[in-house]
Every structure is written in C-alpha cells, then in structure tokens.
C-alpha cells in the first residue's frame, strides 16, 4: 500500500475507474449477446414484433458501445469492430437479401 497521500488517492481513483470500466464492458457484452439471441429468434420466426425487438436491441447495443468509446472504456477501433460484427450478423440473419 502506498504511503504518500497523492499515491493513496491515485490507488483509490484507479479502483473506482476499474469498477466503472468493468460495469461498462459487462453491459456491452450483455447487450451484444441479447442482439444475437434476437437475431436468432427473428430468423426462426420472422414477424413484426421480433423485427422490432431486433431493432431496439441493436440500437441499445450501438448506443452502449458508443458511450463506452466516448468515456475511454473501449478503444475507438474496438468499438467500431464490435459494431461491424453486429451489423454483419444482422445482415446475415435478419436481412439477407439487402
């Protein structure tokens, strides 16, 4: 443990930031998983309510990824890669003819 007051504060700040970053990363992973399950549900039974659920979950995932990038939790390229993979899965499962 640090002895200097400023070093103690930095340790506390680093722990606070670690927990905040962990929460953001966990939320992004959860929303991405929800998107994939919504894609599969729509592919199995395409209907209007399933399509609406897909659009809502995709929008929520994009939003959370963008916020994580904006706050420095994810690197910009990592956020772009996650969004591109979601878009690719969306076009393969939900909208194959487009």
Swiss-Prot record:
Q: Which InterPro entries match?
A: Ribosomal_bS20, Ribosomal_bS20_sf
Q: Does the keyword Transmembrane apply?
A: no
> What are its GO cellular component terms?
cytosol; small ribosomal subunit
The record ties this protein, via Gene3D superfamilies, to: Ribosomal protein S20
Tell me which stretches of the chain form a coiled coil: none
What keywords tag this UniProt record? Ribonucleoprotein, Ribosomal protein, RNA-binding, rRNA-binding
Q: What would be an example GO MF term here?
A: small ribosomal subunit rRNA binding
GO BP: translation
**Pfam families for the chain:** Ribosomal_S20p
- On the tree of life, the source organism's domain of life is Bacteria
* Keyword Ribosomal protein carried by entry: yes
The residues the entry assigns to the signal sequence are: none
Record PANTHER family: 30S RIBOSOMAL PROTEIN S20, SMALL RIBOSOMAL SUBUNIT PROTEIN BS20C
What is stated as this protein's family in its record?
Belongs to the bacterial ribosomal protein bS20 family.
What NCBIfam families does this protein's entry cite? S20
Q: What does this protein do?
A: Binds directly to 16S ribosomal RNA.
Q: What is this protein called?
A: Small ribosomal subunit protein bS20
Q: Which gene encodes it?
A: rpsT
